[in-house]
């Protein structure tokens, strides 16, 4: 598992195209590759499979600092909780990571993350499901 941003993927692979970069990086060894694209979402690659999850459009963004790290923490936290490393579950983890990152940008610093409750996380995940019109089983 490797989680990097799009600029890191380009630098590591020497490719400008994210698809070509991902193919090269996967040949280096990771089974799964997540490429974060900031406010534009994230991509998951594994073998010949690709999944894209957009970021939730946020009207009030106060501080994007740390959102990528919060995404990675939410992603890995979901995987640790579910103990399932299938591609399907990785897609769910992308959505949970994106949901957590969306909370991060709502206030300056980590304050918002200290306030959220599980029901709010589930509601935000539901907003992602509605946004992309797919179901998480």
Where are the language model's segments positioned?
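A short beta-strand/loop micro-motif in the catalytic core of glycosyltransferases
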Residues: 1-5
């Amino acid at each position: 598992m490797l989680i990097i941003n799009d600029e890191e993927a380009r630098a590591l692979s020497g490719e400008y195209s994210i698809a070509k970069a991902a193919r090269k990086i996967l040949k280096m060894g990771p089974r799964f590759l997540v490429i974060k694209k900031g406010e534009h979402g994230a991509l998951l690659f594994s073998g010949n499979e690709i999944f894209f999850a957009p970021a939730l459009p946020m009207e009030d963004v106060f501080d994007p600092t740390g959102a990528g790290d919060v995404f990675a923490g939410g992603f890995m936290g979901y995987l640790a909780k579910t103990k399932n490393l299938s591609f399907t579950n990785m897609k769910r983890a992308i959505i949970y990571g994106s949901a957590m990152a969306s909370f991060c940008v709502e206030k300056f610093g980590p304050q918002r993350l200290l306030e959220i409750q599980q029901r709010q996380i589930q509601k935000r995940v539901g907003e992602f499901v509605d946004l992309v019109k797919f179901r998480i089983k």
